[in-house]
Regions:
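Nucleotide-sugar donor phosphate/pyrophosphate-binding loop at the beta->alpha transition
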Residues: 91, 174-179, 187-207, 246
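Nucleotide-activated donor-binding/catalytic signature segment of Leloir-type glycosyltransferases, i.e.
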Residues: 301, 306-339
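A charged, aromatic-enriched C-terminal amphipathic alpha-helix characteristic of glycosyltransferases
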Residues: 401-405, 418-447
């Protein structure tokens, strides 16, 4: 009972803070926001533009959403910007990979973390992607960080899209442009890991109207929003795609790795990344089993290696497969990014497992797969990723329902040399999709918004 009362009181405090935040913004108040302090960036020149970047996850926390904000922060500093990051509280102990990624950033990047939200009543507060109680803490952290060094522009990267709402208040407070960056969609083609209730939809439309620019990672996402949101200004909706970082490949030049015929002469087909609901292995394992039953000779010619963390719900599928064909797949736990890149470089081919979520977007993994140089086996029925691999001549696309086509793809990969898949189109595409080139495009947007 005491816990229920405590959560109810915390919820009332959150609502009061929300009301104060909205009133202070409307009144253009000079009220000082509270904050938790942080690592204040070293000022490298008062004339340098100052970017305030909202990203709920940031190193040493590590997940698929951190790489784009990290890359922008790194290359913005190199381009002469000052960068302050407002981010969420750390969850758990940082991993070695997360610490390595943090250490890759210039020391002048300021990182300010929101305080953890107090436990509150789910029933008493509006529902929003990322959690309504988190709006105030990250806004407070950002405003405190920039109190004596106002930003030139504010960029909010989502999901979670709670950052968009917080960033809007801070941009209004400092009277600077707000740029929204959609790494995934919010209320249009909503992915399963994003909330899109009534509160989300109301605020998304409000923010899309007020933002100075809206950045999407694919033209398909931009088009979907323009078709779905009435009155959305097409002139301020831009595309800056994801990319790959050449600095991840500095050990050897891109494409220099030799084809992998390791493991006693077998062709190694590698999946590198997290196995979960966006990369489900069960359909692939079923088709692979059908191929091996029908073509025993392939058991001695190839092996599929899965490197990376695996969701518990799919461990049964792996166990079932290994009980029948123990020498045809290999399971490797998560590794640091440098080791993951090395695995991609050594592989004879790279496996991409795609859910229908990727029909309108391209997984970040594909950019690194393309840079690694090996042929790519896309196991998917539809989507932009398969279209891109076909267009670049970088691999093969196999539908999820046909083991005969999967068998044909295996035989094709075994027959063709690695160089067959390294087309001029692939090389040219990589040059225009490096993280440095794309950061330059984003910084141009941030420099020109008003």
């Amino acid at each position: 009972m005491l816990d229920i009362v405590r959560k109810a009181l915390n919820s009332l405090r959150v609502l009061a803070s929300w009301a104060n935040l909205r009133l202070s913004t409307i009144a253009s108040s000079k009220r000082s926001f509270g904050g938790n302090g942080g690592v204040r960036p070293k000022i490298v020149g008062s004339e340098a533009p100052h970017l305030l970047l909202f990203a709920w996850s940031f190193p040493p926390e590590i997940n698929g959403g951190v790489y784009r904000p990290v890359s922008l922060a790194k290359y913005a500093v190199r381009a002469g910007w000052r960068v302050t990051v407002a981010t969420g509280p750390l969850k758990g102990a940082p991993s070695a990979a997360g610490i390595d990624l943090l250490n890759s950033l210039p020391g002048t990047v300021g990182i300010f973390r929101a305080l953890p939200a107090a436990p509150s009543s789910y029933k008493l507060l509006p529902k929003v992607d990322g959690g309504f109680p988190n709006i105030i803490p990250i806004a407070e952290a950002a405003a405190a960080a920039c109190e004596h060094d106002p930003p030139t522009a504010v960029l909010a990267s989502g999901p979670p899209f709670v950052t968009f709402i917080s960033a809007n208040f801070v941009a209004t407070r400092f009277r600077v442009p707000l740029v929204l960056e959609y790494r995934d969609e919010w209320s249009v083609h909503t992915p399963g890991f994003v909330t899109a209730g009534a509160f989300d939809k109301k605020w998304e439309r409000k923010l899309l109207r007020s933002a100075s620019a809206v950045v999407f990672v694919t033209e398909a996402s931009r088009k979907a929003y323009l078709e779905s949101i009435d009155g959305l200004d097409a002139s301020k909706c831009l595309v800056v795609p994801n990319g790959w970082d050449p600095e991840d490949f500095v050990v050897e030049p891109v494409f220099s790795a030799t084809s992998s015929v390791e493991n006693h002469g077998k062709l190694v087909i590698s999946f590198v990344g997290s196995i979960g609901w966006l990369a489900k292995p069960d359909a692939f394992l079923t088709r692979f089993q059908e191929v091996l039953v029908r073509c025993p000779s392939l058991r001695e010619r190839l092996i599929v290696r899965f490197t990376g963390p695996k969701s518990d719900e799919f461990r049964g599928a792996f166990s079932s497969f290994q009980s029948q064909f123990p020498n045809s797949i290999e399971l490797v736990d998560g590794v640091p990014k440098s080791a993951a890149i090395a695995e991609m470089r050594r592989a004879g081919a790279l496996l991409l497992l795609l859910d229908s979520f990727y029909d309108t977007t391209i997984p970040g993994k594909l950019y690194e797969y393309l840079a690694a140089g090996a042929p790519i086996l896309v196991f998917s029925d539809t989507g932009l990723a398969g279209d891109l691999v076909r267009r670049l001549g970088a691999g093969l696309v196999v539908p999820t329902h046909d083991s005969f086509l999967l068998e044909a793809a295996f035989l094709h990969l075994l027959q063709e040399p690695r160089g067959h898949w390294q087309s001029p189109d692939r090389t040219a595409w990589l040059e225009t999709h490096s993280r440095s080139a794309l950061a330059t495009r984003m910084l141009k947007v941030l420099s020109e918004v008003r």
